[in-house]
Amino acid sequence: MTASILQQSVVDADFRAALLENPAAFGASAAALPTPVEAQDQASLDFWTKDIAATEAFACRQSCSFGPFTFVCDGNTK
């Protein structure tokens, strides 16, 4: 079993499930697999990528700037 198969079986739940269904197809044994990492919580991921980004990063779509720095956010671009 290659190192890349071991690594993917640790981080990819779908790949791990396929490997456990038929380990011989991958030249592996189920007993040799390391413990997988915890699966990503989709609600937490959505919070950090959609909710926070929508309210914080994109709250000011236009800005006033002076040189390289934005110092006022009033909704108009100057």
Curated annotation (Swiss-Prot):
Keywords linked to the UniProt accession: Antibiotic, Antimicrobial, Bacteriocin, Hydroxylation, Lantibiotic, Thioether bond
Position of the Lanthionine (Ser-Cys) cross-link: 63-73
Post-translational modification: Maturation of lantibiotics involves the enzymatic conversion of Thr, and Ser into dehydrated AA and the formation of thioether bonds with cysteine or the formation of dialkylamine bonds with lysine. This is followed by membrane translocation and cleavage of the modified precursor.
Pfam families in the record: DurB-like
Propiece residue ranges: 1-59
Cross-link (Beta-methyllanthionine (Cys-Thr)): 60-77, 64-70
Modified residues ((3R)-3-hydroxyaspartate): 74
BP GO annotations: defense response to bacterium; killing of cells of another organism
Cross-link (Lysinoalanine (Ser-Lys)): 65-78
Family of this protein: Belongs to the type B lantibiotic family.
Function in brief: Can act as inhibitor of the enzyme phospholipase A2, and of the angiotensin-converting enzyme. Shows inhibitory activities against herpes simplex virus and immunopotentiating activities. Its antimicrobial activities are not very pronounced.
Record protein name field: Lantibiotic cinnamycin
Organism: Streptomyces griseoverticillatus (Streptoverticillium griseoverticillatum)
